[in-house]
Amino acid sequence: MAKAKFERTKPHCNIGTIGHVDHGKTSLTAAITKVLAENVAGNAAVDFANIDKAPEERERGITISTAHVEYETESRHYAHVDCPGHADYVKNMITGAAQMDGAILVVSAADGPMPQTKEHILLAKQVGVPTMVVFLNKVDQLDDPELLELVELEIREELSKRDFDGDNIPIIAGSALAALEGRDDNIGKDAILKLMAAVDEWIPQPERPLDKPFLMPIEDVFSISGRGTVVTGRVETGVVKVGEEVEIVGIKDTKKTVVTGVEMFRKLLDQGQAGDNIGALIRGVGREEVERGQVLAKPGSITPHTEFTSEVYVLSKDEGGRHTPFFANYRPQFYFRTTDVTGEVILPEGTEMVMPGDNVQLSVKLIAPIAMDPGLRFAIREGGRTVGAGVVATVTK
C-alpha cells in the first residue's frame, strides 16, 4: 500500500484542548475525530486510549507528554494537541512546544470552572493564545437548565477577567461521551459539529511566517576582505531582498544598514525568506559593530527592551534543574534566540521563593536590551545549564 500523499489544499491551524483535570478534554478530542470522520471526507477517528497514552517528548530538556491528532473540517485542516496531565499543559504552553493558534476550553457543566480551568485561561493569556471557544461538557449530568446558565455566566466572567472576549466567545453545550457512544445527537454529534463550526469561524487564521515582517537572529559575523561584513542566521519571519534597508536591533543602539547581498549554500540569491539559512552582506557596518544576539529586522518592526513580565516554568531537579529554590534578587542568564543576557528577577507580590517544578509570573530587568515582542520564548540558564523556560507576556520598558 503506497503512502497517501498529503495534499494541503485547506488553510492549516493549530489548536488544543485545555481545562481542568477530568472535565473531558481527551474524550472531546476523540469525539471530534469520530464525528468528523463520519461527516467530512479525509478524516480518521482516533480512540480515547490512543490519545491518552501520549508519548513523552523533550523540548529544551523539559519532559512533556503530548498527544497530537489531525483532522479537517470543510474549510480548514487542524493539528490538535491534547496533554494528559496539568503539568504537561503548563510546560507545553510556556515552551511553545506545541504552538496554539487558538484553544478549546473544556468545562464540565456539573462542576463549573475549577482551579485549573482558571489557571489555563491565565496561561493562555500569558503565552499569547489569541482566543478560544468553550465546550460545556457533561450537560446530561445537569437536570436544571438554570444551573447551566449560571455555569456559562461564571465562565464568561473568568474569560473577561483575563482580557478575553468573555461576552462573545461561543459556548457550546454538549456531551463528548454521547458523541462517542453515538446517542442523543442533540448533545452528541450535533454539538460537536456546532463546536467545530464555531472553531472555524471564531479562531482567526494565523498569519504565516512568510507574511510577517522580516526578522533574522544573528548567529555569526564575518568580515570578507574587499566586500565587507556578513551576518549569518536562519530567517525567522518574512522576506529580505537585496537592496533593502534593515535595522540591526538589540544589545547596542539600533543601526540602519542596507543588505547588499544574500548568499545561501555559497550561491547568490536575490532574496532570503523565512526558513532559509543565509549570509547577508551589510553595507557600511564594521565587523566589530555587530554581534551574535542582535537581530536583523525590517525597519520599525521590532524594538529593543530591557524590562518585561513573563510566565516561567522552573525545571524540576529530575529534569536537570536547580535542587534548591531561588529568591528575590536572583540573577541568572536569559537566553534569547542566540545569546545569553544577565537579568534580575522580581518575584510576584507575596511570593518569597520559587521552587523547582513551579510555574510563576516573573518580572525581569536585563542588563542589555534585546529585540522583543510579547510571545518571545527564552530559556533561563546558570553557567550554560538550563534551569527554566519562559515566554514574554508584556514589555514594560
Curated annotation (Swiss-Prot):
Q: Which residues bind Mg(2+)?
A: T26
PROSITE patterns in the record, alphabetically? G_TR_1 (PS00301), G_TR_2 (PS51722)
Q: What is its EC number?
A: 3.6.5.3
**G4: where is this region?**
137-140
Task: Name the segments for region: G2.
Answer: 61-65
Residue ranges, annotated region (G1): 19-26
Which residues does the UniProt record annotate as the domain tr-type G?
Answer: 10-207
Main localization is cytoplasm
- Mind listing the UniProt keywords for this protein, alphabetically? Cytoplasm, Elongation factor, GTP-binding, Hydrolase, Magnesium, Metal-binding, Nucleotide-binding, Protein biosynthesis
Q: Which GO CC annotations does the UniProt entry carry?
A: cytosol
Q: Name one Pfam family in it.
A: GTP_EFTU_D2
- Which parts of this chain are annotated as the region G3? 82-85
This molecule's function is given as: GTP hydrolase that promotes the GTP-dependent binding of aminoacyl-tRNA to the A-site of ribosomes during protein biosynthesis.
Which NCBIfam families does this entry report, sorted A to Z?
Answer: EF-Tu, PRK00049.1, PRK12735.1, PRK12736.1, small_GTP
Descriptive protein name: Elongation factor Tu
Q: Whose protein is this, by species?
A: Sphingopyxis alaskensis (strain DSM 13593 / LMG 18877 / RB2256)
Write the gene name. tuf
